[in-house]
Every structure is written in structure tokens, then in C-alpha cells.
Amino acid sequence: MASSAREHLLFVRRRNPQMRYTLSPENLQSLAAQSSMPENMTLQRANSDTDLVTSESRSSLTASMYEYTLGQAQNLIIFWDIKEEVDPSDWIGLYHIDENSPANFWDSKNRGVTGTQKGQIVWRIEPGPYFMEPEIKICFKYYHGISGALRATTPCITVKNPAVMMGAEGMEGGASGNLHSRKLVSFTLSDLRAVGLKKGMFFNPDPYLKMSIQPGKKSSFPTCAHHGQERRSTIISNTTNPIWHREKYSFFALLTDVLEIEIKDKFAKSRPIIKRFLGKLTIPVQRLLERQAIGDQMLSYNLGRRLPADHVSGYLQFKVEVTSSVHEDASPEAVGTILGVNSVNGDLGSPSDDEDMPGSHHDSQVCSNGPVSEDSAADGTPKHSFRTSSTLEIDTEELTSTSSRTSPPRGRQDSLNDYLDAIEHNGHSRPGTATCSERSMGASPKLRSSFPTDTRLNAMLHIDSDEEDHEFQQDLGYPSSLEEEGGLIMFSRASRADDGSLTSQTKLEDNPVENEEASTHEAASFEDKPENLPELAESSLPAGPAPEEGEGGPEPQPSADQGSAELCGSQEVDQPTSGADTGTSDASGGSRRAVSETESLDQGSEPSQVSSETEPSDPARTESVSEASTRPEGESDLECADSSCNESVTTQLSSVDTRCSSLESARFPETPAFSSQEEEDGACAAEPTSSGPAEGSQESVCTAGSLPVVQVPSGEDEGPGAESATVPDQEELGEVWQRRGSLEGAAAAAESPPQEEGSAGEAQGTCEGATAQEEGATGGSQANGHQPLRSLPSVRQDVSRYQRVDEALPPNWEARIDSHGRIFYVDHVNRTTTWQRPTAPPAPQVLQRSNSIQQMEQLNRRYQSIRRTMTNERPEENTNAIDGAGEEADFHQASADFRRENILPHSTSRSRITLLLQSPPVKFLISPEFFTVLHSNPSAYRMFTNNTCLKHMITKVRRDTHHFERYQHNRDLVGFLNMFANKQLELPRGWEMKHDHQGKAFFVDHNSRTTTFIDPRLPLQSSRPTSALVHRQHLTRQRSHSAGEVGEDSRHAGPPVLPRPSSTFNTVSRPQYQDMVPVAYNDKIVAFLRQPNIFEILQERQPDLTRNHSLREKIQFIRTEGTPGLVRLSSDADLVMLLSLFEEEIMSYVPPHALLHPSYCQSPRGSPVSSPQNSPGTQRANARAPAPYKRDFEAKLRNFYRKLETKGYGQGPGKLKLIIRRDHLLEDAFNQIMGYSRKDLQRNKLYVTFVGEEGLDYSGPSREFFFLVSRELFNPYYGLFEYSANDTYTVQISPMSAFVDNHHEWFRFSGRILGLALIHQYLLDAFFTRPFYKALLRILCDLSDLEYLDEEFHQSLQWMKDNDIHDILDLTFTVNEEVFGQITERELKPGGANIPVTEKNKKEYIERMVKWRIERGVVQQTESLVRGFYEVVDARLVSVFDARELELVIAGTAEIDLSDWRNNTEYRGGYHDNHIVIRWFWAAVERFNNEQRLRLLQFVTGTSSIPYEGFASLRGSNGPRRFCVEKWGKITALPRAHTCFNRLDLPPYPSFSMLYEKLLTAVEETSTFGLE
């Protein structure tokens, strides 16, 4: 009875239009407060605020006019000025003036990641269902996305529609109302299943359905007693693809009523707090009944959102059976009385939001009637939702009626009387009627709800049972937004013969064009042909994935994924049964084949699971997009087909769609994958009625030239939307695809500089149907009962899901494109990313290993990415996982520049590029003596100084040799290099000179089978000492160029060719070389430049210096800033050339105060050692870190740790105990670390224990913990971070992180992890950009930092800084950015639109532009991270470091120097350096590639990073402890490690082969701790 009483109260509440609705758990107030406040109340003011007259302190939303006539030329402009906190998920909605429910918006726009607290947008209002009266009053409301709080409302705006004839609408509505108002029908829903529901951070949801009957939207439809019937399904545990087996739910309703279905998560865990709303549908009953004459059918709808800020993904499928209709004259009121209280009380057997129901309850799904649960929802707008922007909406009614088939009558049909009798009998007690027995055995009682009984507890847990009410409340007015409805998708069993008609019949009837968002939403449904589904699904999915827990068997998942994936404009993978060329679109136009329910859905492979993994949660885009994605293609409504070709599609199972064309191209090729949803919306709006083209295009086959579609496996396999949009002429389609192809080609060409592994180069011909893996993965992982924290911080995945279609990726892999347009690959099983395309699927047993282990053992090269970890000594022939995958990337990259490349095998391409980079021109350009030689050639020097393009090219090549591939045929570069050629010498071996038909000489390199106009007889050797520019080579941190110092090495797949790799130093003995540290030389340069008369000295050899003000400023900058300044300017060609003139003076110069310092011991002239450091304590591996800070840094670091100890940081006596499950690493770390107070984090000792492992934490487990956490937490997979623009191993905060659930807490957690690692002296295997470290230190960024975020933008501003812009650039202090889906102008300073940029104020302009660009979209996230960091560490202590130093403290280095390693290794148990086993050991280590060496290091020490000082300073459990190899064990045993003591126990193996095999096995396969 308690339940019924509560239901009654809620029933009453939802009919009160003045009720205040809770929009999200975060906004929960006490229940009492909820019953008092009107939603449209203006901002409440504090009683103490006496300034009630002025509005300066209040948020405002205003319009440019308050009378608007539809069709007028003048735009309606909405202005906002929000004083409170704003968020990327904020939205503005258009409402009827009397509307109080936030969910009943007629149109809405989301803000997106850019934008500020003030701004304006143009709002287009178009005639539609909501404006069918001569005059109607509306208003706009601004809502905060996270809390749902109303920020501001506009005054009343009157919209006039001169085209409407008075009374026509009213008469029509009234007539129809009278006609049907007395006709009650009974219908049953069965075979319900959902696909691709949104996942939480750590858990799969435990979904259940809430279904109810509500009156239609029009005011002429009365509210009757039967309204409020409610059903709740059983709870399906731990799945994103629930199937309610054999459960039936019957209702009776008027034809004018609507059926509302809401999916919620019965979330009973304590943390983290999440939203339980998973999606909703609002479907007119008439639409369902219209299927009766068509035959058996499966309906599929994309789930919609309640509010624009909701993140929803997936779709719902079910069958409808009309069981009876009541006498036409039966009065609904009379029926209501028969139902009596029953209609108010919910089905007792169904889960209740507030009560735990005993598992034994039988849900009489079929029989009982109950009020609809509150939440169900207003949002589900009926078809006619009004959208102001122009997007194509198709009337589902038409579509469904034509395309769907009704199911044959069921064996048991209940008459209305039976139904009512059953209700009467079961009413309060238990819903089990006869039909109950039909209930699926699959839903076991234990899966039933176990909701907390106390509503206050719910509020505390932020699990708002009212949230549901609210949704429901949204008022039975259901905005008819298509988004919500999602088009209806029919799975027809019938043959495809009549499909064509479906499309033709779809009409754009009364669905007005909706806002771009909506359109994106809608656009998403494509059906796939049943024919290809089975093949694709089978081939791509792992064999027989286990059904999800709670589901009896394979879900009938439409293979629509395939089709929908295309949504985005990708071509459909249709394989016409007729055998017609797939390249041509079906004659029928865009008609899509309905996937046959039995064939495609019940394949057994459970594509749905697959998709669920992919889970397209649109969330990633701004809401509008999210809507689109929410209706994953499954909805076949044209709407979706239409514009939305957007990412909504991305949710597709790419596996199915192996041939998809490129999604990207469908969307704007130039748009970054992570664009705000508005962008996408815009795309949708752009082609309101072009759904056809999208579909048609889908059918066409991807041609080699076109960019393959990046298909995102959306979690929902798109249900095959039966209807397809009308298809434009094939000619038009042809043009579209030609245009796309050319755009893609252009894009590929533009990216010709070698791309990172996955970039546009791939576009050339590969369409990876990646999500197939996802499917497989899901099947596997879900089968185990617990889905690994797949999307810990859950981000709207569609945002980034773009897949190139090539051959299908292995199961559970997906290709995405980042915000810089680069392709990377996502492993959904291990939650990792990599730049290399995965090859063969992993062995089955690998999938059963824990995520963190796999993460270390599989292709995840995130931070140990090729560029960071590969040493120059690494043999090219190594093609293991690390660069085996890279081969393809290389191939793709090369294809951008070499069109012929695609005919070469990968290995050929790779070796050719390698040979090219070892060619004489490259060796000459990167030679340390290059500038010296340049000075000796006056004509070449003159050309170099006068040609800025040439200087730029040479600088780029010296920074990253892979750029040579791009510039090698440049006329200026060729002519320049040929000036140095010695034509008297013979050609190098393997070279030949020939002449073309014009008599021009060219050279053939038979080694690489290439030709060039560059004469290879270049001066590669110099008699001058090699120390000329040692500093330049060492300024670059080989391990983790924190800010991408190596320039764009990210654009190529092979190891970077650093400016001066260690191999270029032909030292007499390795130990000597090891002493050569750049520190001394850099210090010498600074000291030399700090001489009082330095400018006079410099002018003696460089007279032009007096006129070169830029160079003088750089010298002065170094004099002021010291070595940090020198580091920053280390790649400046002019400065380097100037310093090269004074090489001897610099080397011989010793400051007076340093004469006695051991660091300045002179080395013999001619020795490659420029300045050996004789202090043994400071020996360090060559170029391990930026030299400039060596001695200073050591002093700072010692002092820093001393102060930490003095202040009691990490000293105890308490312990910070972390008990971690390896397969729930982030979840456990987040919950435990965020549960400690600031004081505990600072004071207590850290003690980490891995569950099920006996090891004691004498630092080994703690080190591995930080290693593993850093690899997961800072992984772009979760959407919090993204790879920087310059490389593929440093990361930065992603603007799209704003769409990750609970993202502020995640960034705070990230900051705490950084702080804990710092005070406990552990290293993180994570490398960030320089601006990130500056943000941690709260240091302002400058122009040089911008290069790490946007290289081209940096170059533009740099050019502007270096050149006179007088009368050249017409700029003002403004910048354009996208807000609420529109490009708006933002002022960089007050009145900036009227302030021109001049030579005088350009410095300020550059500073403001840099600040805007660096902070864009990440200000709040950065603040949260910094806050978490300083909750652990005192800001004053950390402030002693600069950005580069802080990076060294946090991340150490990872470029392994074997000589340093060997020289700092100890031996025990009879081993010594010359022992045969030890020699074999080091030979094996040398044979390892750098990644394997790092694994060995991680195996023995617990981390792949090493301290900045090198191996001499490795730490153990009680201080520094060197790497040690001890003779131990039988030769049959594997080596074992003691991570707390950095010791490797190595048995005395009898042969090198055995040692190598055993060592490799131990390193690659071992990952747990044991206790001796």
C-alpha cells in the first residue's frame, strides 16, 4: 500500500503545472522543496541584497525583438549575459509562454565547448506544428547543463503566422478528437530489447523499462482515468543490451494517446554518483495500431533525451499486437471507473524506484495496469515536434505505416473484459495473471529491483526517483521532438521487394524542420540489408559470443549498424542481392533493406552486444549531436538519414560496415572529429531534405579514392531502419561522392607531410570496419558477467568515433579521429589507444587477462609510443607489435606524398622511406657542421638568408628528418643543396647520373630505387671539431619531448631521427661519451653571452647584427633568462648560425667564478667530449634530459624533498592504504583516493596492495600502481585527455572532456594522482605538453607554448610577430568561435571589435590570442586538475621548479641508454661483468627494441621510467638502489624480479638462445607480485 500511496501522490504532482522539477541528481533538493517552487521563477535573490533595482548582478536573456512574424527577413537574435557558472552542456530552449517543464521545449540549442558568459546567436523560427495559430506567445530559457538550473528567461515574444487561416487548425483537431475520443483499444508489447545503452563510468547499467499511457499533446485531448497506466519490466543486470525475454505488457488507450517508454538504470551502488536516465520514447498510439494490417513486425526506435543536456545512446525494439478494441461508444471515463484505483497503482511486481521488491514478484507484464511512472516522460515528443532550424523530419506515421508489418495475432488474445477482470482481481495485490506465466524465465528474481526504500537516502545518493517524475512531469506535454522519438525502424520479415516503396512514401509531413541539434539526432537511421548482415556479422564477430548476463540469448540486434554507420554519409555497405554492382545505389532510390528480424537479429552473434560496446553515446557532441547519435541509425526515420549523417552514425558497428565510405567526408572533411555537436548540427541543417543523398551514398561502394567512412561502432547496431529517406537522383549522388572524393583527396594531399600513424594518409583506401571488434569484445567481456570499466569516465563516444573502412579491425578495436584529424585505434577490451593499426586479433586467452595487464602487454604504445621509446639504435627490421602496426601507418603516411605508394607492399614502402632518410642530403642537413659549411659557401649563405621558405624547410628537416620526404623535390631546396656538391668526386656506391629529355641531370639511387635532382656528392664530413652545436642536439629531450620538441615526428611511423642521435658521436670509448653532457656547453653559451661587451664581440664577425633587431632581442632574452631561454630558442636558425661562428670562443670561455668548478674541466681539443662532468654523482645518460638544468635541478630537487620531509609529507604515522583490483584499477583508485581528506593524502605513508597478490609494498607495488594508473587515467580512450598536436606521445586536456560524466571530479582525481606521485617520489608513465606543466605551476603561457597545441596557428602568430604588419593585415581584437552551433565573434578585450591590430599593439594581440587559444574549452577542467594537485602538494614547494623541471620530476625519462644501464648495474651470486651469462644477458638486451627494454626495466623495477639522473639514481624501497643481476635458480625456471630492490634473479642458462627466450617470456608475460 505504501507503494500505491506514493504513486498516487506522484500522479497528483505530475498534473500540477507549477511543480518544480528536478533535472538531475545533482540538483536534488529536499522533497519538500520540490513541491513549492515554480520552474519559471526568476533567479532568487538573497534577502540581504538591497540592490533590487539594477540588474547588473543578475543573469539575463533578451531578444532583439518581441514581436516576430514568420517569414520576415529580419533575424531574431537572442542575447545572453550569465553571471553564474557556465558549462559546455548549457542550453537555450524555446518554450510556450505558459510552459513550466524544462523538457517540453519546442526547440533548443546547446552551447558547446567554446563560448563565454556573454554572447548572442541568431535563432531561426519557421512555421511548424507549434505555430499553427495566427498568434502565439513564446519565450526562451537558458539552463545550466550540469545542474539543470534555470539561469535566465526572456520576456514574452509574440510570434505571428500570417499564413494560418483562422479556425482551420482548431476545427480539424476538434473533429478528429471527437471522432476517436471514444475508441479504446487494447494492445500488447512483447519481445522488448534495448541495444547500446549508455554505460556508466565503472559499471554497465542494470536497465529496466517504465511504460505508461498519457494523453496526447493537444489541449483538445482530455485527460481520462485510463491515463497513467504504468508497467515496469524486470531488471536486467549488468548489460547495455538488455532483452526482456517473453515479457509482455498490455495497455488500453485512445487513438489520440501516446505511449511513453523510459529506460532507467536501477543503480544501487554507492559511488560514483551517476544519472539513472538511459533514454526514452514517446510514440502516438495511433502509429502503433496502424501496423495491424501490415503483418508481423519488429519496431525499432532510437532513444531520445529528456533534456538537451542528457547523454543518451542506443535504441529500443519491440513488437506490438493489437488484442482488441472497445465499443466505439465506450466512454473513457467509464473505463476509468472500472479501472479505479488500479490505474493509479503500479504493477506491484515491477521494480519501484523507492522500494525493494522481493524477487518473487511476478510481473504480470501482460495483465496489470498501472499509472505511468512519472518519469516516463514528457520529453518524448510526439512526432510533430517543432524544430526551428531547418532539418528534415519525416513523419514517422507515414513511414511506419508503409514500411512496417503487423505481427500475426498471438495465440492468446485478451479481450478487454478479460483484461479488466484480471486487473480487478490483481489490482493491488499482485499482478500475476494468466499471462504472467508467459513471463520470461530469463529475468530471474534476483535481478529485480532492490531500490533503497528511503527517498531521502535516494536524494543523498543522488539517485533521483523523482528524476523520473520529473521526466514524466515534463508534463504530459510531450514536445514532439523527433529527437525523442527517433524514427521508427521496422524490421520486416518480408522480403526486400517492397522496400523501395518505403522510401518513396516517406513524407516530410508535419514535422517541421528542427533545430540543428534535433536534426543531427534524427538523422540517424539506416537499415541494412539483411543479406550482408549475416556475413559481416559473422566474420567480424568472435564466434559465439556469450549472451549477456541476464539475457537468454543473442539479441536480435539489427545489423543496422552497418547501415547506420553510414548515416554519417558513409556509403552503405549494401550488397544488393541482385548482384548489381554495389557501387550503384539501388534503383529504388535510397531505399534501404529492412533487416529481417529473424535473420539479422537472431544471428547469435549478438551484434547488439557489440554495438553496445561501441556505445555511440552521442554525448560527446554537444547535445544536439547527442540526440542524433541517440537515435543511432536504428531509427530509420528519414530524419536521421537526413542531415544527421553526422556522427550519430558513428555508433554503428563498424564491423558490419566494412565497406563504408568515409564518415568524415560525409561530415565535413575538414571538421575535426571532436567538433562540437553544433557543428554537426549545422551539417544537418545544411541539407535539410537531403537525407536521400546520405542514404544513397551509403549504398555506393567505397572507392579507393574516397576516404573510407570512419565507422563508429555504435553501441546500438542500428536497427535497420526500414524506411529510408527519399533518395535524390543517382546523378546527384554521383556528384556528391565525387565531390567527397575530391575533398578527401585534397585532405590527404594536404596532410602530405608524414602523418602520424593513423592520419589522413590512411584515408587513402582504408575503411576499417573497426567496431566489429567492439562487438566481439563486448560479447566476451560481458559474458564474464562484469564488463571491465570500459568507459570509466564515460564520454559520448560518437564524438570521436570515425572509422576508416579497410579490412575489419580485430574484435573490440575501433578507429577514431582526434581533434587534430589524426587516426588512432581504440582497444575496448583493455581501454587503451594506439597509433598503430592492430593486425591479427589476439589469442582468446589474452582476452581473459585483466585490463591493466593487457594494457601493458598488448599494442598499447600510448606513452611508450614509438617516437618516444624507439632509440636510434633500434634495428629497422624489428616489426613486432610496436612498429609492425606502424608499417601500415608508414604506408599511409607515405601515400599522402607519394601517390604511387599504394602499389608498393608495406615493407617496401617502409624500407624506402628509411633509405631516403639516410640519404646524403638528409645526412648533410642534419650534420652538426652544416652551419659551419654554410658559412664557408657565400652564395649558399646568401640564398639561405634571403629565402625564408628555404630557411623554414631546412629548420623543419633538422628538427625532424621525415620532413625531408615532403620537401625533397622543392626547387629552392634542390638548388641550395647542389651548391655544396663536389662535382669532381665520384658518385656514392649505388648511385648513377642520367639526363632527362631536356638535358637536365638527375640522379638515380639504386639502393632505394628512387630518383632525385639533388647531387649526392655532398660534404658529409668535416675536419672541424664536432662540438659545434652540441647544445642543439641535447636540448631535445629524447625520451618525452614534453612539448613536442622534435617537431612533427608524430607525423611518421618510424622512430624519430633526432637532430644529433648518439650514433653520430664517434667517440673513442663509450664511457667518455657518456660524460659528455650538454649542460656545460649550454652554460658556457649563456656565460659567454652575458659578457658586458658581448654585442661588440658578436658584431666583429656578424656586422649585420646591428640591423637585426630580432636576433639582438633573442640574445638579450638568453642573457636574461639563462639556459631556459637558450632551450626555447634552440631551434632558431639565425641564432644557431651566429653561435657557430664563435664555437672556439665559447668552448674556451670560462667564467671567472667557475674556474675552480670541476664541471668546467677542459677536454682535449678535438675530443668529441665538449665538457666532461667529472662529478660521479652527476653522471647521466647522454641527452637524457634537458641539460641546462642539471646541477641547478639537482639542488632544487634535493631541497624540495628535504622540505617535504621536514613538513611531514608522506611520513606517517598513518597509512594511505589502497587495495586495488587489477581489473578495476581506476575504479578502485578513484573511489579510495577521492575518499581521503586533503590532510590524509599529504601526511600518510602510501601502501598499495593488489587484491589476490601476496607482495608487500616496499615500493614495488606502489611504483607499478602509479605506472598502471598513469597509463589508464591519461589515456585518450576516456576522453579526458587527447594527444597533442605535435606528437603522439604527449597529451593535453581535451576540450571534449566537458562531455565526460563527472569530469571535474576526474580532473581533480588526476591532480591528486600527480601530487601523490610527486611527494612519494614515484614516476608516472605519462608525458604532457609544456603548457600543461605551466598550468600546474600557474605560470602564464607564451607564444612558444602554442606550438604544442596548434602548430599552424603558432606559425601564423610567429610570422606576425617577426614581420611588419603595417597595412598588410586587417585584423581587430576579436576571434571567431562556434557557440550554440553558430560562428560568433568574440572580443579579446572590451571594445575589441573596434580596435585594429597595428605594429604597435600586435604584441598585446598575440598575447591575448595565445591565451584564448590555449585556454579554449579547457579552463574549468584545468582549474579542477590544479585544485586536486594542490590538495596534495604545497604550491610554495613546487614553485621552485619550472615547467621542464617539473616534467622531469613527475615523469623521469624513458629513452634507455644501454651504456649507462650497464655501467650502473651490480652483480651478485658469482656473476660479474665479464661472465658469459652476463655477456649473453646484455647481448639479449641489445637485441631488444627500446620498448622491450622498457618492459624489462618495468619488470625488474616496477616502472618503465627512470630518474632524470639515469640508472645511477634508480630508487629502491629505502633509497637509491642500482639495477642488480643475481645468479639464482634452475635453468628450467624463468628469471624472476624483486621490484622493491631492483634485482633480477637470472639462472645460469647454458645457451644464449635459452636465455633470450626465457628472459623475453618473463618480461612479456609476468605481471603480478608474490611474497617470498
Swiss-Prot record:
Could you tell me which residue ranges the HECT domain spans? 1237-1572
**Chain intervals with Low complexity compositional bias:** 400-410, 744-776
Region annotation (Disordered) ranges: 341-452, 489-796, 1024-1069, 1161-1187
The UniProt annotation puts the region (Interaction with TP73) at 737-1068
- Gene3D superfamilies assigned: 2.20.70.10, 2.60.40.2840, C2 domain, Hect, E3 ligase catalytic domain, Hect, E3 ligase catalytic domains
Name the pathway it acts in. Protein modification; protein ubiquitination
EC number per UniProt = 2.3.2.26
A Pfam family that the UniProt record links to this protein: C2
- Annotated ranges, domain WW: 807-840, 985-1018
Chain coiled-coil ranges? 847-874
Swiss-Prot/TrEMBL GO biological process terms: protein ubiquitination; regulation of dendrite morphogenesis; regulation of mitotic metaphase/anaphase transition; ubiquitin-dependent protein catabolic process
Keywords (alphabetical) are: Coiled coil, Cytoplasm, Cytoskeleton, Disease variant, Phosphoprotein, Repeat, Transferase, Ubl conjugation, Ubl conjugation pathway
Q: Where is the composition biased (Basic residues)?
A: 1031-1040
Instruction: Please report the PTM annotation for this entry.
Output: Ubiquitinated and degraded during mitotic exit by APC/C-Cdh1.
- GO: which molecular function terms? ubiquitin protein ligase activity
GO cellular component terms given for this protein: cytoplasm; mitotic spindle
What disease is mentioned for this protein? Neurodevelopmental disorder with hypotonia, seizures, and absent language: A neurodevelopmental disorder characterized by severely delayed psychomotor development, absent speech, epilepsy, encephalopathy, hypotonia, dystonia/dyskinesia, and macrocephaly. Brain imaging show cerebral atrophy, enlarged ventricles, and white matter abnormalities.
Name by which UniProt lists this protein: E3 ubiquitin-protein ligase HECW2
Species of the source:
Homo sapiens (Human)
